[in-house]
């Protein structure tokens, strides 16, 4: 069953292999990232003030290239727990408008986000290596 969003319903998959700015119509979509080619990718989230209740999941469909990072950016903080699946370590991200998958992150690395109208909350995040907060 499709999930409702502002002005309609959605629940589709969206492929991402280049810089992408998400729209309100992308609410509920699962983004499948393809960072298999060299070169960083930035996924920009919608403005928080117009996105209360907006949810998205971003998953690497293939392993990142050794020279590729996939960064998710917002106009405000992205907060919550992040788990490093390789070491089992977890970290609580308290501030910062960017989170992402590092060079050579493996397929299946994921982050699920929801907006409360003031910030983005991490509902679930796991990667085989530590997540990044900026492109390098």
Give, region by region, the residue ranges found by the protein language model:
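A conserved acidic, glycine/proline-rich C-terminal tail/linker
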Residues: 92-102
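Extracellular beta-strand-rich solenoid/capping regions of secreted or surface-exposed proteins
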Residues: 49, 100-107
